[in-house]
Amino acid sequence: MLHWLLMLAMLAGVIGCAGKAQALDSSEVAFEGQNYRVVHLDLKHEQLGLYWRDPQGGQAFGSIESLRQWGEAHSRRLLFAANAGIYDHKFAPLGLYVEKGKTVVPLNLAHGNPAAGNFSLLPNGVFAIYPDGHAAVRTSAAFKADGKQARLATQSGPMLLIDGKLNPQFVDDSSSLKWRSGVCAKTPTDVIFAVSEGPVNFHTFGRLFRDKLGCRDALYLDGSISQLYVDGEGYSGAPALMVKPYAGIFAVFSKP
């Protein structure tokens, strides 16, 4: 009898550990009067992918919900999702977009294009994950100079932090307040996504990554359309009525 009790206890422990392995590090963080949803991804255990179009039909996913349903149809549960970088009026990436090692849209080094909005607030940058599983946030110029092919990458802007310093174009008391999302690679395998639960300016959002989250290089992803999704918690960020189609979605699915 004791033998069977021990076996059941061990089995329960294994099941419990398996369940915990699927749980993401998600928390609500308060910073200077505003709340943020912050998700840490350990790339040693969580496979972060980037998705724009259905690989079968070529139709753009457009929304996190569409991607979630696609995952279900393939017996994969969506654990985490976030919009990728800035895109143009045709809902195509405005800058570099790399998916599964293929460069779909090349690096954009154009300067001073007013139609590009925040993307033209320089320097802009790239968030990339390389074939060795390591992630990095670099300015667009630094990414080009590296010349390394990424497994996945999105280009957006502006850079929030460059080598531990705030983007010099940010103004402390700016009245440009919006929902904002961003990403940093705190270490090569510790990726942090954050979205504000209310409108904030760039200066405050950059300081969140520097002073609260401990990042040295961080990239702004997008503004008032930005949301994060975490399985079991739902959506955080901009109100649903403000969300528009995305041209690229970061996602972590359950393992088959």
Task: Briefly describe each language-model feature range.
Residues 1-4, 122, 178, 245-247:
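Short, solvent-exposed loop/turn segments at the edges of secondary structure
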Residues 5-16:
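Bacterial N-terminal signal peptides
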Residues 17-118:
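Zymogen propeptides
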Residues 92-166, 170:
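Active-site-adjacent helix-turn-beta-strand microarchitecture at beta-sheet edges
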Residues 94-110, 169-217, 226-256:
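Conserved, well-ordered active-site substructure
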